[in-house]
Structure formats: C-alpha cells, structure tokens
Amino acid sequence: MSMLRLQKRLASSVLRCGKKKVWLDPNETNEIANANSRQQIRKLIKDGLIIRKPVTVHSRARCRKNTLARRKGRHMGIGKRKGTANARMPEKVTWMRRMRILRRLLRRYRESKKIDRHMYHSLYLKVKGNVFKNKRILMEHIHKLKADKARKKLLADQAEARRSKTKEARKRREERLQAKKEEIIKTLSKEEETKK
C-alpha cells in the first residue's frame, strides 16, 4: 500500500479543511496514488473518491440542562463555590444596580408629577445615603410622605376654616353689641327728651 501523504495534503488544501477531515477511498488507493496535482485531486473529489468528513457532533444538551438547573439554584451550594462572595457577586455591582433602579424610579415619579422637585432632591440624597434597601421600601416611603403631606394640608385647611369662622362670629357679635348699644343710647336720649 502506497503512502498517500501528498494526496491527503493537496486534498485538505483544496477542500479547505484539516488533513484529519479528509477521507480517501481505501478501495481506490492506486487511482488516488496516481493523482499528484490539485487538478487531479479536484477530479477525484468530484468522482467521490475523496470526501470531506462531516464535523464531529459536540452536543451542548447536557450543558444546557445544567445551566437551566443552575438558574433554579441547583449545583450552587457551599461545596461548589470557589471564590469569595464579593468575587462571585461584587458589592459594587450590587450597589450600582440598586442606585440605578431607585434613581430611575425617582426620575419617573418626578416626570409624572407624582413628587415635586424638592421631595425628589431630598429622596435622592437619602437614596445615596443607603436609607432604602429596595424599590418597594422607597415607594412605601413616598406614599407615606404624600399621605402625611395631604393630612397636614387638610388639618391646616380645617384650622384656617375654624379661624375664619370664629373671626366671622366675633365680628357679628361685635356688630350686634354695637347695634344694642346704639339702641340703648337712642332710648335713653328719647326718655331724657320726654322728661324735659
């Protein structure tokens, strides 16, 4: 059996693949051995004596299955961990994500006129100062602030109404007293006139 090293090299060059991927027909070795140019190799490829082997399957099914399991939290216990908690999920990244979420919420609330710019600024600084652990707590805080503001406004309005009411009542009382005084003075003056 002759060595077909040259033919294999030429075939790999023509087929544009590695020498491992070239299949030479073992029943037609003599004919293949006679081919010593690229043109002849091309003819043999056309005839089917030289074939490019298909790509070996490297399945990712198991890998996909494991990835899905890891998303559920499987294979992620203490025994599987190599790095520190900070190496696996950096605190800085967690902080940045939280800041972006909370600041986005504040911006959205300000744009939709749910909070005014003064409240926005004070809450922004509180967010920066690590007051709110997550979005839910910030939203609850905003609702509470708004409720307190509304309650204060209501109480102020009620107090104002009460003040204006007492003012009106005092004014009416003074007017009545004044009218009574005038009446008494009139009657007294009439009596004095009749006596004379």
Swiss-Prot record:
Domain of life: Eukaryota
One GO CC term on file: focal adhesion
PTM sites of type Phosphoserine: S13, S164
Keyword Ribosomal protein attributed: yes
Region of interest: Disordered: 157-176
Citrulline modified-residue sites: R5, R16, R38
Modified residues (Phosphothreonine): T187
GO BP term, pick one: cytoplasmic translation
Residue ranges, compositional bias (Basic and acidic residues): 159-176
Keyword annotations of the record: Citrullination, Cytoplasm, Isopeptide bond, Phosphoprotein, Ribonucleoprotein, Ribosomal protein, Ubl conjugation
A GO molecular-function annotation: RNA binding
UniProt modification remark: Citrullinated by PADI4.
A Pfam family recorded for this sequence: Ribosomal_L19e
Location(s), subcellular: Cytoplasm
Cross-link Glycyl lysine isopeptide (Lys-Gly) (interchain with G-Cter in SUMO1) per UniProt, renumbered positions: K181
Assembly with partners or alone: Component of the large ribosomal subunit.
HAMAP family: Ribosomal_eL19
Family that this chain belongs to: Belongs to the eukaryotic ribosomal protein eL19 family.
Function: Component of the large ribosomal subunit. The ribosome is a large ribonucleoprotein complex responsible for the synthesis of proteins in the cell.
Protein name: Large ribosomal subunit protein eL19
Source species: Homo sapiens (Human)
Gene that produces this protein: RPL19
